[in-house]
Amino acid sequence: MARTSFKLEHPLERRQAESARIREKYSDRIPVIVEKADKTDVPEIDKKKYLVPADLTVGQFVYVVRKRIKLSPEKAIFVFVKNTLPPTASLMSAIYEENKDEDGFLYMTYSGENTFGSA
C-alpha cells in the first residue's frame, strides 16, 4: 500500500480548502498528489503536488513523473490510482472525476513494479 504522507502532514480541512482554491483559480487544471509506493526501488520524487492540464493523458503524465525522478529509459514505471493502473490514453480530467479524493485532490502512486497485478 502506498504511503499517504501528504494526507498525514495536512489536515482534511486544509487540503479541501487548498484544492477548492486551486480549482477556482485554475479551472482547466487538475490538482494531483504523486507519491512513491512502498517497497519499490525507483527514486523518490522531488515534488509531490502537481497542477496538471485537464487535457493531458495519463501516458503524458507518466512521462512527467519519469523525468522528475530521473528514471533511465530501460527501467519501467507504473502509476496507480486507487491501486489500479489507469489506461495510458485516458485524460487526466476523466481519471480525476472518477477517482478524486474527498479532499479534492487526485492521489497517484508510482512504482518500478506492477505491484498490484491488474491492468
Curated annotation (Swiss-Prot):
Phosphatidylethanolamine amidated glycine lipid modification positions: 117
Organ and tissue specificity: Constitutively expressed.
GO biological process: autophagy; protein transport
One GO CC term, this protein: cytoplasmic vesicle
Disulfide bond annotation, renumbered to this chain: none
SUPFAM superfamilies assigned to the protein according to its UniProt record, in alphabetical order: Ubiquitin-like (SSF54236)
Gene3D superfamilies: Phosphatidylinositol 3-kinase Catalytic Subunit, Chain A, domain 1 (3.10.20.90)
Membrane-related topology note: Lipid-anchor
Superkingdom field: Eukaryota
Annotated propeptide span(s): 118-119
Location relative to the cell: Cytoplasmic vesicle, Autophagosome membrane; Vacuole membrane; Cytoplasm, Cytoskeleton
Positions marked as site (Cleavage): 117-118
Function as written in the Swiss-Prot or TrEMBL entry: Ubiquitin-like modifier involved in cytoplasm to vacuole transport (Cvt) vesicles and autophagosomes formation. May mediate the delivery of the vesicles and autophagosomes to the vacuole via the microtubule cytoskeleton.
Sequence similarity: Belongs to the ATG8 family.
Name by which UniProt lists this protein: Autophagy-related protein 8A
